[in-house]
C-alpha cells in the first residue's frame, strides 16, 4: 500500500546523509549449510548481506506486513528477498537506520562508567539500525512489484541515492523462493539488472517459521468460534512441532530444530482441490470469490448429517449429535437433482468443510504418531481466512478430544520470503530475541489489506495527501465482512462449530502485519520475579466492555490532543494539516481495533497508548506538550526551595509521610486524564498542587505506608539497613517530578542510597523525558546541596562534574544521582523491553519505585520483583478506580511489596 513503506523518526529524519556515509562493510564469504537430506545447500555470497544480530520488531506496518530493525547492519547488505507464488508475490525488504546519539557526551560517559556499561552508547530507545518490511503483490501484476523495487532502489547495492551521485546497477543476486523464481528470472534481469538465485521452498518455510515463533512474542494464536487467543511460546520449548503448509496440496513437516526437519506426510487434497472442484461446480473465477460464497452457504442442503439417518435424532451411544456430518455431499446421492438445482453457496461451504476437516484430522494423526504437542498451520489455503481456521481448529479439537489446539501464525504468508531472506550469509537473525523486536503500525494499516497500490510515498506531504484522498472519496476503512450464521454446521464425524457466525471474518485482513524493528539495545528487566509469566497490562481488553470503554476514552480525548499538538508548533497551516491527518489516522486505528481487537496482535492498554504516540510522531509532532512542560517546570522550580525548607524542619517520621503525600498529590498533573484537564482550566499548577496535597488523608485506598515506614525507619529501636540503589520510575513533568519525586529522591540520597531516575526515551503526553531531566535536576540543585553533590557524583551537572575515578575530589559521603532512559516513548511501560542502560542499572538495585497511573496502575500493578517495590499513584479515572481498587476518582495507591521469592 502506498504510504506504508516508511515511518517518521524524530532523531533520524535529519541524519540521512550521515547514515549513507557509514563505511562499515562485511566481507561475504561463501558457506555451505546442511539441508535435511544431508545435501549441502549453497548459500550465495554474491550479494551483500544483512547483519541481523539483535534484531527487533518495531515500527511500521505495511498494512498486514511488518518491518524488522537491524541495529548492527553494515552498508554492504542484501536488501530484499521474495517468495513468488502462483497467486501472490511476498516481498521482504530491509531499510537501514542508525542511532545517532553522541557517545562523546561527557554526562553520558560519566553515567555509563558508574553503571559499568562498557559497550554501546546511552541512547536506550530502540536503535534503528534496520527494519524488515513485508509487502505483497498479486503475481499477475508483477510489473507493479518491479516498479516498487525500482522506486525504492532495492535492487542496487547502495539503495540510498543521497550517498553518491551515480549508482551502479546492482548486478548481484536476489534470493527468491517459489515457482516464480524460474518463471520470472529473465524479467528481473531485463528490468532490474539482477539475477535470481532460487532457494528451496521447504527449507525457507521452516526457517521462516522458526524465526517467527522464537522472535515474535504474539505470533501464534488459536482460532475457535471466531475468537482469537494469542499463545506465548517459550523459545526453549519450541521443538519439536508439526508445521502444516496448505497450498495447492498439503505438506506436513516435522521440525526438530534449526535446520532439522523432515516431510513426514501430506495429501493431494488441499487448496488446489478446493479451488479446482469449486471452480468446476460453482463457476467461480477466483479463490477469494469461492471463499466469499461459502459465507452464505448452508451445507445441510448437500451434506448427509447423522440426523438425516436417524430421523433427526442424535446417535448418542457413540457420541454423535444430529448435526454431525455423516457423509460430505452425501445428500446428493438420494436426491433427483442436477448441479444447477444446488446453490453455489451451499456447494462452496460443503466443499470447504470437507477439505478443512480432513486436513485437520490428518494433521492431528501425524502429531499423535510422533508425539508432538503443537501443530501450526499456514499456506495459501489459510491466508488468515477465519472460517477456514475455525473449521480446522474444530477438527483438531474433536479428534484430540480437546487435548490439542490448532495454531496459526500472524505472518504466515511471509514464511517463505523470510526464509529466503535468511538464506543470505551473515543475515544475523539467528540470535534475535523477542524482547529486541518491536512491531509498529503506520497510518495506512487500517485502510487496506496489505496490497501495494502505486509507487511508495516519498515524504510526509505525500502521506497526508494520501490520507486526504481517502476522506475526499468517502472511503471507509476496509473491514472484514461479517458472516451470516449458518443454519447447519455439521462436521465430518464430529460436532459443528457453534453458530457464532457474526464473529467470523471472510478475508485475510482480519489480522494486520506491521513493520518489524530490530532493536539490539532492548532487554528484559532483570529484576522481574518471573519474566515468563509477567503480564504488563492490568486491564483485560479482551473483555468487550473494557475494550469499548477505553477505545471511547481515547477517541474523546483526541480533539484536545490535536489542539495541543498544533498549538505546540505555533498553529501554522502546516501544523493544522498534519494535525487533521493525525486525527484521521488515529481514528482509523481505533475503528479498526473496535472491529477486530486482534488486528495488531494481542491488545493491551499499553499498546494502545504507544500506538497513539507513534501516530503523533509519524506526522512529525515530536513533543506536543513541550511548551506546557516548560511552563510547569518553571512554576514548580520556583516553589521548590520553600518545600525543601519545610521538609527539613520536620522530624524524620513526619518528613517521610509528607514526602509520600507529596508524590501522590503531585501525581494529579496528567494531561492524559480528562478529569485533570478540566482542573487545569480552573486553576494554576501551584493552586492545584496545594489543593491536592491538602486533601491527602489516610488511610488511602491502598495504604501500605506503615510497612514502608518500618522498612525505612525501623521499629523497636532496630535500625534497618539502607537501600543500596533505588530505581525511581518518574511520570509527569512539572510538579509531579519536581515537587513529588525529586524530594523523595533527595531523601534516599540523604540516607546514602544511590538513586537512578528512570524516564521516557521519547516524549509521551506531558511525561518527563530522560533528556529533560538533567536540566530539571540542575535547576533544583541550585537550591539544595544534597541534590547538587549527588548530581555532580552522578554526572548530571556538566559544568561541575566529579570524575568518578578521581579520589581527591570524590565525597565518600555523597551517593550519586543518575538518569537513564527506559527505552520507550509511552505513558506505560512493558518491562519485557527496557533499555540496556536501565537493565545495567537494575543489577545493583534493591528498590524499585513505580510512580503514576501508566507505570504503576495501567501496567505493572500486579508485577512482582526480586527486590522491594513501591507503587505510588493517584487514580484519575473513575472506572479504573472502581475496577482496580473498588474506590473513586482521586483515590490514592501506596503499595509496598517485599521481594518476591
Curated annotation (Swiss-Prot):
Disruption phenotype: No visible phenotype under normal growth conditions, but homozygous double mutants pank1-1 and pank2-1 are embryonic lethal. It catalyses: (R)-pantothenate + ATP = (R)-4'-phosphopantothenate + ADP + H(+); (R)-4'-phosphopantothenate + H2O = (R)-pantothenate + phosphate; (R)-4'-phosphopantetheine + H2O = (R)-pantetheine + phosphate; (R)-4'-phosphopantetheine sulfonate + H2O = (R)-pantetheine sulfonate + phosphate. Residues 1-10 have a biased composition (Acidic residues). Phosphatase activity is strongly promoted by several divalent cation ions but it is suggested s that Mn(2+) and possibly Ni(2+) represent biologically relevant metal ion cofactors for damage-control phosphatases. GO terms for molecular function: ATP binding; hydrolase activity; metal ion binding; pantothenate kinase activity. A motif (Subfamily II EGMGR motif) lies at residues 851-855. Residues 467-901 are annotated as: 4'-phosphopantetheine phosphatase. Activity is strongly promoted by Co(2+), Ni(2+) and Mn(2+). Activity is inhibited by EDTA. Its cofactor is Mn(2+); Ni(2+). Signal peptide: none annotated. Its EC number is 2.7.1.33, 3.1.3.-. Residues 1-50 are annotated as: Disordered. Mn(2+) binds at residues 731-732, 767. SUPFAM superfamilies: Actin-like ATPase domain (SSF53067), AF1104-like (SSF111321). Catalyzes the phosphorylation of pantothenate the first step in CoA biosynthesis. May play a role in the physiological regulation of the intracellular CoA concentration. Functionally redudant with PANK1. The phosphatase activity shows preference for normal or oxidatively damaged intermediates of 4'-phosphopantetheine, which provides strong indirect evidence that the phosphatase activity pre-empts damage in the CoA pathway. Hydrolyzing excess 4'-phosphopantetheine could constitute a directed overflow mechanism to prevent its oxidation to the S-sulfonate, sulfonate, or other forms. This is Pantothenate kinase 2. It comes from Arabidopsis thaliana. The lineage of its organism: Eukaryota, Viridiplantae, Streptophyta, Embryophyta, Tracheophyta.
Amino acid at each position: 500500500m502506498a504510504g506504508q513503506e516508511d515511518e517518521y523518526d524524530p532523531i533520524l529524519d535529519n541524519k540521512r546523509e550521515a547514515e549513507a556515509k557509514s563505511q562499515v562493510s562485511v566481507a561475504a564469504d561463501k558457506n555451505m549449510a546442511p539441508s535435511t537430506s544431508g545435501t549441502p545447500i549453497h548459500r550465495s555470497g554474491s550479494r551483500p548481506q544483512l547483519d541481523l544480530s539483535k534484531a527487533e520488531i518495531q515500527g511500521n506496518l505495511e498494512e498486514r506486513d511488518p518491518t524488522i530493525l537491524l541495529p548492527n547492519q553494515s552498508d554492504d547488505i542484501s536488501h530484499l528477498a521474495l517468495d513468488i507464488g502462483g497467486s501472490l508475490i511476498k516481498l521482504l525488504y530491509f531499510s537501514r537506520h542508525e542511532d545517532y546519539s553522541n557517545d562523546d557526551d561527557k554526562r553520558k560517559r560519566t553515567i555509563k562508567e558508574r553503571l559499568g556499561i562498557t559497550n554501546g552508547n546511552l541512547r536506550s530507545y530502540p536503535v534503528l539500525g534496520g527494519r524488515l518490511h513485508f509487502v505483497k503483490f498479486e503475481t499477475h501484476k508483477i510489473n507493479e512489484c518491479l516498479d516498487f523495487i525500482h522506486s525504492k532502489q532495492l535492487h542496487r547495492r547502495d539503495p540510498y541515492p543521497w550517498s553518491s551521485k551515480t549508482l551502479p546497477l546492482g548486478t548481484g543476486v536476489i534470493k527468491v523462493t517459489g515457482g516464480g523464481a524460474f518463471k520470472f528470472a529473465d524479467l528481473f534481469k531485463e528490468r532490474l539488472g539482477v539475477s535470481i538465485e532460487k532457494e528451496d521452498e521447504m527449507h525457507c518455510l521452516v526457517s521462516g517459521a522458526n524465526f517467527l515463533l522464537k522472535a515474535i512474542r504474539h505470533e501464534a494464536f488459536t482460532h475457535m468460534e471466531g475468537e482469537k487467543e494469542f499463545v506465548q511460546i517459550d523459545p526453549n520449548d519450541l521443538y519439536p512441532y508439526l508445521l502444516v503448509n496448505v497450498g495447492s496440496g498439503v505438506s506436513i513437516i516435522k521440525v526438530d530444530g534449526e535446520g532439522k526437519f523432515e516431510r513426514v506426510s501430506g495429501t493431494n487434497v488441499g487448496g488446489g482441490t478446493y479451488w479446482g472442484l469449486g471452480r468446476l461446480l460453482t463457476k467461480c473465477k477466483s479463490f477469494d470469490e469461492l471463499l466469499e460464497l461459502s459465507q452464505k452457504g448452508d451445507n445441510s442442503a448437500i451434506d448427509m448429517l447423522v440426523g438425516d439417518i436417524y430421523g433427526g435424532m442424535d446417535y448418542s451411544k457413540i457420541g454423535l449429535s444430529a448435526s454431525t456430518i455423516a457423509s460430505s455431499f452425501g445428500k446428493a446421492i438420494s436426491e433427483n437433482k442436477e448441479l444447477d438445482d444446488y446453490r453455489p453457496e451451499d456447494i462452496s461451504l460443503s466443499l470447504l468443510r470437507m477439505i478443512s476437516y480432513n486436513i485437520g484430522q490428518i494433521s492431528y494423526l501425524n502429531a499423535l504418531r510422533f508425539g508432538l504437542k503443537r501443530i501450526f498451520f499456514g499456506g495459501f489455503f489459510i491466508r488468515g481466512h477465519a472460517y477456514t481456521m475455525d473449521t480446522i481448529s474444530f477438527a483438531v479439537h474433536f479428534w484430540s478430544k480437546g487435548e490439542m489446539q490448532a495454531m496459526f501464525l500472524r505472518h504466515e504468508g511471509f514464511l517463505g520470503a523470510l526464509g529466503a531472506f535468511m538464506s543470505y550469509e551473515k543475515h544475523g537473525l539467528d540470535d534475535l530475541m523477542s524482547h529486541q523486536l518491536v512491531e509498529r503500525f503506520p497510518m495506512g494499516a487500517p485502510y487496506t489489506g496489505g496490497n501495494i497500490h502505486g509507487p511508495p510515498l516519498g515524504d510526509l506531504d505525500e502521506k497526508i495527501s494520501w490520507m486526504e484522498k481517502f476522506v475526499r472519496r468517502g472511503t471507509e476503512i476496509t473491514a472484514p465482512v461479517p458472516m451470516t450464521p449458518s443454519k447447519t454446521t455439521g462436521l465430518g464425524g464430529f460436532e459443528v462449530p457453534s453458530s457464532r457466525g457474526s464473529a467470523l471474518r471472510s478475508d485475510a485482513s482480519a489480522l494486520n502485519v506491521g513493520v518489524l524493528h530490530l532493536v539490539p539495545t532492548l532487554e528484559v528487566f532483570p529484576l522481574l520475579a518471573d519474566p515468563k509469566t509477567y503480564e504488563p497490562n492490568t486491564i483485560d481488553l479482551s473483555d468487550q466492555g473494557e475494550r469499548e470503554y477505553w477505545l471511547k476514552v481515547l477517541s474523546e480525548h483526541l480533539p484536545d490532543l490535536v489542539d495541543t499538538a498544533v498549538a505546540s508548533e505555533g498553529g501554522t497551516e502546516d501544523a493544522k494539516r498534519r494535525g487533521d491527518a493525525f486525527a484521521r489516522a488515529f481514528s482509523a486505528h481505533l475503528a479498526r481495533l473496535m472491529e477486530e481487537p486482534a488486528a495488531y496482535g494481542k491488545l493491551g492498554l499499553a499498546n494502545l497508548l504507544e500506538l497513539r504516540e507513534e501516530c503523533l510522531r509519524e506526522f512529525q509532532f515530536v513533543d506536543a506538550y513541550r511548551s506546557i512542560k516548560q511552563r510547569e517546570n518553571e512554576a514548580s522550580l520556583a516553589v521548590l526551595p520553600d518545600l525543601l525548607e519545610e521538609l527539613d524542619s520536620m522530624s524524620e517520621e513526619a518528613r517521610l509521610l509528607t514526602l509520600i503525600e507529596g508524590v501522590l498529590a503531585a501525581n494529579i498533573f496528567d494531561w492524559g486524564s480528562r478529569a485533570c484537564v478540566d482542573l487545569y482550566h480552573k486553576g494554576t499548577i501551584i493552586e492545584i498542587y496545594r489543593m491536592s496535597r491538602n486533601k491527602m488523608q489516610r488511610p488511602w485506598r491502598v495504604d501500605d505506608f506503615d510497612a514502608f515506614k518500618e522498612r525505612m525507619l525501623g521499629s523497636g529501636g532496630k535500625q534497618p539497613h539502607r537501600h543500596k540503589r533505588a530505581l525511581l520510575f518518574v511520570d509527569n513533568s512539572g510538579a509531579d517530578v519536581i515537587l513529588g519525586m525529586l524530594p523523595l529522591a533527595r531523601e534516599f540520597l540523604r540516607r546514602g542510597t544511590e538513586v537512578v531516575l528512570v524516564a521516557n526515551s521519547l516524549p509521551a503526553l506531558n511525561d518527563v523525558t530522560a533528556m529533560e531531566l538533567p536540566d530539571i535536576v540542575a535547576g533544583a540543585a541550585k537550591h539544595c546541596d544534597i541534590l547538587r553533590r549527588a548530581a555532580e557524583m552522578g554526572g548530571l551537572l556538566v559544568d561541575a562534574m566529579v570524575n568518578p575515578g578521581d579520589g581527591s575530589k570524590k565525597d565518600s559521603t555523597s551517593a550519586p544521582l543518575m538518569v537513564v532512559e527506559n527505552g520507550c516513548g509511552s505513558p506505560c511501560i512493558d518491562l519485557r523491553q527496557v533499555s540496556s542502560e536501565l537493565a545495567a542499572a537494575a543489577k545493583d538495585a534493591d528498590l524499585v519505585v513505580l510512580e503514576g497511573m501508566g507505570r504503576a496502575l495501567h501496567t505493572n500493578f500486579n508485577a512482582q520483583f526480586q527486590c522491594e517495590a513501591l507503587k505510588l499513584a493517584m487514580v484519575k479515572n473513575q472506572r479504573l478506580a472502581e475496577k482496580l481498587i473498588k474506590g473513586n476518582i482521586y483515590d490514592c495507591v501506596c503499595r509496598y511489596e517485599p521481594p518476591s521469592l
